[in-house]
Amino acid sequence: MNKPTPAIVSQDAARRLPRWALLLFCLAYAVPGLVGRAPWKSADLASFGYMLEMARGQTSWMDPRLLGLRPEADGLLPYWLGAAAIRLGDGWLAPAMAARLPFFVLLGLAMAATWYAVYLLARKPQAQPVAFAFGGEARPSDYARAIADGGLLALIACLGLAQLAHEITTSVAQLAFTALAFYGAAGIGRRRWWPEIGLLLGLAGLALSGAPTISAFLGAGAAVLHVLATARPWRKGDWRVLGIIALATLLAILLSSSMDLWRWRILLPQDAGSKDWRTILRLLVWFTWPAWPLVMWSLWRWRLQVWSRTPSLHVALPLWFMLVTLVAALTTKPADRALLLALPAMATVAAFALPTLTRSVAALIDWFTLLFFTGCGAIIWIIWIAMQTGYPRQGASNVQRQAPDFVASFSLPVFLVALVATLVWGWLVHWRVGRHRAAIWKSMVLPAGGAALCWLLLMSLWMPLLDYVRSYSVVVRNVMAIAHPAQCIQQWGLSREQVAAFAYHGGYRISQATPDQLECPWLVVNPEALAGLQVQASAGQWQLLATLRRPSDKGDDVMLLRRTSP
């Protein structure tokens, strides 16, 4: 028996967002940040370093190393994808751009899988809106498309998605495969086999991307929920569903075991202080904004469908995916990369809040979003004008303080792109304040549009500045001005990303210095490891030529030393 539904939706409110507009919207969000920039500190650059070494044949594809160091993130599949793209693009595409192409596809896969997952869940009988006495309620397919549009917009609106989803790390692969597994679990049992294939690839890909435990828990929980959500769980068709989910989960577990992917990374509660918990709480608030208030609202309005003997899958399934990834974020580090995996499920739960919102709540969302993103966009423009003209003086001085040697440049195409994006935002605001728009996804238009606008402005107007302060190109150029890349050079205590930066930006083949092998005339040293070097080698053998500092980061110095005696 279906529980009373809180959704009251007319056919007029179930209008769908035009496909071309939704596609352009996704492209406007996904493309900026993937093109026109150097690899950034730290995980983005470190991952690229391993991919570059693999593509050049400098390390094994089954056990990649960077000067003897294994990757911090487990899972080989993302590195394989990036390295294969670099090798295929050799000669006609820059390595950094080639490595980003598979991750651009993965981001698009995450968006598409989220849309289809929401659509399939919204088609379920328990998710349908109230039937009107004299007709006029939304048709099931139109209602599901409108909810799916809202879910995708809610995903894009999440503030934490922007930077991490545009990197070339295992986190992006985990996000895509989590969304793919979510789609498979949402649609399994239909006549077509696409959801089953999606579930199998999603759980296996998630395990191969370094999250085998999450993969196992998601698969097991999906199987249990499908049993609990069925009034007669032991029919032939339900046995088939349970068997497919169990098989996909078992294959992911066996794959993880065969490749030795299981790692214990859990931080027990006594390992984290009160300050860490406060930090995590702040991360949850801003990272998942604006989805989390809608999630709370949705869980309250749909509580009868969740807390019952036969829970409704359209809320219970995304809730399980959300809880598993939230627990992973609370018990592992870095928390933000684990929290990224919760966003597709949170966006789904938030989407089911849209048909239950009152006018006052919808208006509050619109006005807060309008003020917040308009203010953010204005600040980005003001700082850019200050970089170009020196006025306002306060903005120019702030930039000069953070990047003392940065010289701004003007690009007409970049300016026009940013200007068009700002004008589109103005049109979007004008459209939204119109009283004639009744679509249920309308409350997500401004949050998603504002997030896309600010990200696009940052990745266009501020790109030269961000490249200057977030990449190691400046440090490498300063070293190249003293030590030519063709000369023998060793390193002592550098991080993975620093080694990768010297290999990519300078073409250096830096070797690892050891106490009994300090034969090169040049030595690049991490200042924190200098004391250890002085213990192993005579201080009089080396002359400090320069201490090179990465802009905006005083704790990321590099020291260049030259041998003075054999």
Residues covered by each model-derived region:
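Transmembrane-helix motifs of polytopic, lipid-linked glycan transferases
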Residues: L101-R139, I156-A157, L180
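Hydrophobic/aromatic residues in alpha-helical transmembrane segments
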Residues: T114-A117, L161, A181, V295, ...
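Membrane-embedded architecture of ER/inner-membrane glycosylation machinery
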Residues: K3-L23, S171, G187-P566
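Intrinsically disordered, low-complexity acidic Ser/Thr-rich regulatory segments
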Residues: G135-A154, W462
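Aromatic-rich transmembrane-lumenal/periplasmic boundary elements in polytopic membrane proteins
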Residues: L27-W61, W262-D271
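Extracytosolic helix-loop segments that constitute the early lumenal/periplasmic catalytic or substrate-binding loops
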Residues: S47-A73, L77, A84-R87
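Short acidic/glycine- and proline-prone juxtamembrane loop motifs at membrane-interface regions
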Residues: G160-A173, P212-I214
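Loop-to-helix entry region of an early transmembrane alpha helix in multi-pass inner-membrane enzymes
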Residues: L76, W80, G89-A117, S141-D149, ...
